[in-house]
């Protein structure tokens, strides 16, 4: 799981 990419998915 990518937590950093989870909120950086913009």
UniProtKB/Swiss-Prot annotation:
Major localisation: secreted
Subcellular location: Secreted
UniProt-listed GO biological process terms: neuropeptide signaling pathway
Highest taxon listed in the record's lineage: Eukaryota
Keywords associated with the record: Amidation, Neuropeptide, Pyrrolidone carboxylic acid, Secreted
Pyrrolidone carboxylic acid found at: 1
Any one GO cellular component localisation term in the record: extracellular region
Residues with Phenylalanine amide modification: 10
Family affiliation: Belongs to the FARP (FMRFamide related peptide) family.
Role according to the record: Increases the force of neurally evoked contractions in the major power-producing flight muscles, the dorsal longitudinal muscles and so is likely to play a role in sustaining or promoting flight behavior patterns.
Name of this protein: FMRFamide-like neuropeptide
Species per Swiss-Prot/TrEMBL record: Manduca sexta
């Amino acid at each position: 799981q990518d937590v950093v990419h989870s909120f950086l998915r913009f």
